[in-house]
A protein has these predicted regions:
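A short beta-loop-alpha structural element at the N-terminal edge
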Residues: 1-17, 178-193
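Conserved donor-binding loop and adjoining core beta-sheet/short helix segment
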Residues: 31-103, 242-264
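Acyl-donor-binding surface of acyltransferase catalytic domains
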Residues: 86-175, 326-333
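Conserved GNAT-family N-acetyltransferase fold
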Residues: 57-59, 146, 233, 243-247, ...
């Protein structure tokens, strides 16, 4: 039986449907599981003694462009598993995922490229589907990053039960600070503040400043600033830039939109505040400015990434109404899974 026939057969569809029921019970902002497509030749499936399919996966390989900004956000070579585990939350899900990860480990062990230092085995698992955590830890994965979500009022209505994701009331900037929409003349300041964020996040194992990072970030911000009414803001104390925020409108955020079940989705790419200004309300005012504009534009949900172990990110984004939607688990190098 071919990998394609396994991934698209009735048993795989049933496993995906059961996983979807578990996801929605855990978090109404999650999407329905998408059908799996064969992107490697490994048959990743786990069955019960009677033949019932318990878990199935599809693996893919991403090799970074050395000049692209994407390379800054993780390993240069990423092996990613999309997993569908059948059944309700509980020990059976943990066991089935553990066995599936073991099969994937065997596949990666057969690939010489997975043993290189700048590689990662990656799996996105719903943050509130806690049945997967023990299996991932057992196999040598670490929770490096989070995709967090903040539903707007309209988005919360669309996803029944997600009302707790709606953010706080609008925050005004602290005294002496003004927030304005960025212009092309602000490019240098935006890049400088953005690099501070990247360099701080690099302490936590996910983000890496590359030789191409400055040029790639400059090109990314320049392209965003060329759009009409860009979702980019600068916070200034007097004439001194002290904070920035860059976000993608739903039209530009299609790449991450499938990670949630409500639409349209925007993406907060990067927000940074000068270290001397942290804790004073600049970041909250920037996040509030972006959320207000996104809601006025009809956005249902805002997504963003933050480093799981960054001691500043998790409490800050929680205070702004964001909560974990997906956890990005990584094993580095990819061939070193247990």
């Amino acid at each position: 039986m071919s990998v394609r026939s396994v991934l698209t057969g009735d048993a795989a569809l049933r496993a995906g449907a059961e996983a979807g029921l578990r996801w929605r019970a855990a978090d109404p902002l999650l999407p329905a599981p998408a059908p799996l497509h064969p992107e490697c030749d490994a048959e990743l499936a786990v069955a019960a003694p009677g033949g019932e399919l318990l878990a199935i996966g599809s693996c893919a390989h991403w090799l970074g462009d050395p000049d692209a900004l994407d390379l800054t956000w993780g390993a240069a070579s990423r092996f990613e598993l999309s997993a569908r585990v059948a059944g309700p939350a509980g020990p059976a899900v943990t066991d089935a995922l553990d066995r599936l990860l073991g099969r994937w480990r065997g596949h990666l062990a057969s690939l010489p490229s997975a043993a290189a230092a700048d590689t990662a085995a990656v799996i996105h698992w719903p943050s509130r589907d806690v049945s997967g955590a023990a299996a991932l830890l057992r196999r040598g994965f670490a929770p490096l990053a989070v995709i967090a979500a903040r539903a707007t009022a309209a988005g919360a209505r669309a996803a029944a039960g997600a009302g707790s994701a709606v953010g706080p009331k609008a925050s005004a900037p602290p005294e002496g600070v003004r927030i304005r929409r960025a212009t092309p003349d602000d490019l240098e300041a935006l890049v400088r503040l953005g690099l501070e964020v990247i360099r701080f996040d690099a302490h936590f194992g996910g983000v890496r400043e590359r030789p191409s990072t400055v040029a790639a970030l400059t090109a990314e911000f320049a392209a965003m600033l060329a759009e009409p009414q860009p979702w980019m803001w600068l916070a200034e104390r007097g004439s001194d830039p002290v904070g920035m925020l860059a976000a993608e409108k739903p039209a530009q955020a299609q790449w991450i939109a499938p990670m949630t079940g409500i639409a349209p989705a925007a993406y907060l790419l990067l927000m940074g505040v000068r270290a001397s200004e942290r804790g004073g309300g600049v970041g909250a005012a920037l996040a509030s400015t972006m959320a207000t504009e996104a809601e006025a534009a009809g956005t249902s949900v805002i997504l963003l990434h933050y480093a799981q172990v960054n001691p500043l990110s998790a409490p800050f984004w929680s205070q702004q109404g964001y909560r974990p939607l997906w956890t990005c688990w990584e094993g580095r190098p990819a061939g070193a899974l247990r």
